[in-house]
Amino acid sequence: MISRSWLIAIALLIVSPAAAQTSESPVAWNAGVLTQSADWYSSSDARRIADTVVSHQSREGGWPKNTPLNEIARADADPGLANTFDNQATTLPLAFLARVATATGDATYAAAFRRGLDYVLDAQYPNGGWPQYYPLRGGYHDNLTFNDDAMVRVLNLLKAVAVGQQPYGFVDDAQRARATEAVSRGVEIILLSQVRQGDRLTVWCAQHDPVSLAPAWARKFEPPSLSGSESVGVVRFLMSLDEPSPEVVVAVEAAAAWFESSAIRDTRLETYTNAEGQPDRRLALSPGAPPLWARFYDLTTNAPIYMGRDSVAHPDLADIERERRMGYTYVGAWPASLPAEVEAWRRRVAE
């Protein structure tokens, strides 16, 4: 005789088929929304997310940062997060909407994309750079912003639009022409802002003054400096250009040489428990360890610098407060694969 518990289990399977199979996890709002299968972008789930993304679009045409755009916009949303290119804001929703618009043919998503694209193009400074926020807010937010790859993400998006790369084939000729011109001016400002030490070109700061192009401050612990992090994305963008100009070639080669000479060798970054029993980080001697790079380098000496909230430059990570050591990334392997990428680029350019 079948037991009562077995009968209950069978009944549950009948009334709830989902219990008999593994349900798919909902798609989170992050860069993963750009790497779904082609069929997914025409699904009801993709449309639902696209509808909420459109609902978050501002009057100006941009999007907020640090906001789950796959969820309904909150009435009490922080207006300070709106209209920015920081943390993949605006560029990520645009790339997502383009995929859904192409997959579904829905004019609503295409229109939201076009309005967002106009916002991106309107935000460009006459000299070719982009601020972190637009409309402008003042302070360091108005600087040309390479920080967290903001300008590089914008330029990569516009470059794809300009050539009609999928999923941007629905963009009309007028906007494509504007995108082409914007990329050209963007490349020009990148070349002009590359930091020069005498006759030697180096790399870039995470942010540059929009008028003088000098390396500029951001937050109290983000000084004018040579960036061992953001400069990597700039170099990769320059290497992505078809038929690079002689000036672009010089810029890439100079940056590659700077990265090679600025590596921190025989050192590892380790997490340990300090004397107070707290998790902490330090740089430790480690012969043969893979190279590391500092996020900030002195503009004159090229020495790594570490800065806490007191805005004082120090030569060692141990010299700043633990809160920053654990809460910010001062050292990393960002350019580790760059030598191989540069070598492949050289072969392509020589063809």
Show the residue positions of the predicted features.
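Positively charged n-region of N-terminal signal peptides that target proteins for export
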Residues: 1-5
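Bacterial N-terminal signal peptides
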Residues: 6-15
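Terminal, non-catalytic domain-edge segments
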Residues: 21-49, 160-185, 212-218, 222, ...
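N-terminal carbohydrate-binding/catalytic regions of secreted carbohydrate-active enzymes
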Residues: 43, 47-91, 96
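Long, well-ordered core segments of solenoidal/helical folds
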Residues: 48-62, 112-129, 180-199, 251-268
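A cross-kingdom feature marking solvent-exposed beta-strand/loop segments within repeated
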Residues: 65-85, 129-146, 211-223
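Long, hydrophobic/aromatic-enriched structural stretches that serve as scaffold segments
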Residues: 81-106, 112, 116-119
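Eukaryote-skewed repeat-based solenoidal scaffolds used as protein-protein interaction platforms
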Residues: 110, 114-117, 121, 138, ...
